[in-house]
């Protein structure tokens, strides 16, 4: 029977992680459990930086971005001896189970711990929205608002200077954040892992727009696909129109979470605790059609590539 649980955040931070921690802590305490926070993710678990949390530990955090527990990337956690040390630290505190908030790398760690006898529940916290088995990850819609704000500002200055702007947006192998940002921001062109890039066609379309009197253009580009500055130079050379690249970078991860993310994170945190109380381990939570669901964490890892949103790409194609 579970009496003590731990909670940690791992990998890249996302707005709403604090709300998720709060959901876990408050629910666990309401159910008569003791709760421990692990600082700086799996690194802190390995180093034994674990502290008991109470209701006041999560007061006034629901509106704050980032994660007060801290986060860190710790690839060494793949090593068996490192995980054994982490488990030793869990045992010192009598922790029976763990809620892991993060992305795909965090899920892999949770899977490994579950296989070694420590039941874990994964909670999707990443702005990339690249986790299978959930319509939304915690932090995604908050990041979307941040990107839209940046695009709106870039459109103002691009219009003033008759400039083409390339906006590089996070997402890694998933174009969801770029796609939604492009539609909501009224971007003229979109380049994601799902669309790929036909550079000649892109330049031809831009030239057609200029010939029709288009004064500026915004191109939404998913990170890691290509060098945004190099693409800007190629477009400027071909069109004669000033072209600049803006890499939004880590600003997308910061800021206060939206109301949606606060509610989503709270619901998921609550649900994760109840799954542990029901005896589940090696599962991950999600939300599908507004309903909370849970899946085998292995399925989420092996099917990390989310289905392509062909319906939204069709909308984007007709609007651009």
Swiss-Prot record:
Binding site for ADP: 22-26, 155, 186-188, 212, 214-216
GO cellular component, one term: 6-phosphofructokinase complex
Annotated localization: Cytoplasm
Entry keywords, A to Z: Allosteric enzyme, ATP-binding, Cytoplasm, Glycolysis, Kinase, Magnesium, Metal-binding, Nucleotide-binding, Transferase
Domain of life where this protein originates: Bacteria
Catalyses which reaction(s): beta-D-fructose 6-phosphate + ATP = beta-D-fructose 1,6-bisphosphate + ADP + H(+)
Sequence positions that bind Mg(2+): 104
Enzyme class: transferase
Residues the record lists as binding substrate: 126-128, 163, 170-172, 223, 244, 250-253
BP GO annotations: canonical glycolysis; fructose 1,6-bisphosphate metabolic process; fructose 6-phosphate metabolic process
Nucleotide-binding keyword on record: yes
InterPro entries hit by this protein: ATP_PFK, ATP_PFK_prok-type, PFKA_ATP_prok, Phosphofructokinase_CS, Phosphofructokinase_dom, PKF_sf
Active-site feature positions: 128
Functional pathway: Carbohydrate degradation; glycolysis; D-glyceraldehyde 3-phosphate and glycerone phosphate from D-glucose: step 3/4
Molecular functions per Gene Ontology: 6-phosphofructokinase activity; AMP binding; ATP binding; fructose-6-phosphate binding; identical protein binding; metal ion binding; monosaccharide binding
Oligomer status and interactors: Homotetramer.
NCBIfam families linked to this entry: PFKA_ATP (TIGR02482), PRK03202.1 (NF002872)
Function per UniProt: Catalyzes the phosphorylation of D-fructose 6-phosphate to fructose 1,6-bisphosphate by ATP, the first committing step of glycolysis.
Protein name, per record: ATP-dependent 6-phosphofructokinase
Organism encoding this protein: Vibrio parahaemolyticus serotype O3:K6 (strain RIMD 2210633)
């Amino acid at each position: 029977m579970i009496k003590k649980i731990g909670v940690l955040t791992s990998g890249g931070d996302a707005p709403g992680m604090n709300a998720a921690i709060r959901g876990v802590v408050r629910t666990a305490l309401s159910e008569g459990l003791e709760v421990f926070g692990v600082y700086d993710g799996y690194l802190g678990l390995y180093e034994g930086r674990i502290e008991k949390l109470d209701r006041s530990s999560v007061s006034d955090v629901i509106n704050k971005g980032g994660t007060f527990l801290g986060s860190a990337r710790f690839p060494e956690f793949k090593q068996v001896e490192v995980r054994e040390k982490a488990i030793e630290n869990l045992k010192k505190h009598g922790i029976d189970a763990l809620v892991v908030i993060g992305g795909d790398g965090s899920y892999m760690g949770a899977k490994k711990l579950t296989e070694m006898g420590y039941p874990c529940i994964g909670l999707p916290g990443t702005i990339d929205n690249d986790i299978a088995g959930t319509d939304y990850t915690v932090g995604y819609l908050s990041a979307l608002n941040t990107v839209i704000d940046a695009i709106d500002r870039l459109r103002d200055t691009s219009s003033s200077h008759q400039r083409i702007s390339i906006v590089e947006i996070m997402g890694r192998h998933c174009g969801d954040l770029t796609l939604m940002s492009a539609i909501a921001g009224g971007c003229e062109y979109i380049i994601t892992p799902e669309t790929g890039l036909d550079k000649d066609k892109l330049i031809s379309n831009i030239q057609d727009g200029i010939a029709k009197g288009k004064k500026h253009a915004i191109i939404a580009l998913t990170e890691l696909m290509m060098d945004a500055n190099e693409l800007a130079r190629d477009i400027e050379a071909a069109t004669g129109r000033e072209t600049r690249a803006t890499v939004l970078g880590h600003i997308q991860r910061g800021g206060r979470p939206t109301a949606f993310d606060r509610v989503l994170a709270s619901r998921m945190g609550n649900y994760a605790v109840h799954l542990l109380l029901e005896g589940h381990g090696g599962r991950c939570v999600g939300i599908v059609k507004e309903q909370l669901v849970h899946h085998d964490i292995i399925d989420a890892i092996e099917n990390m590539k989310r289905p392509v949103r062909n319906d939204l790409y069709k909308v984007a194609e007709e609007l651009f």
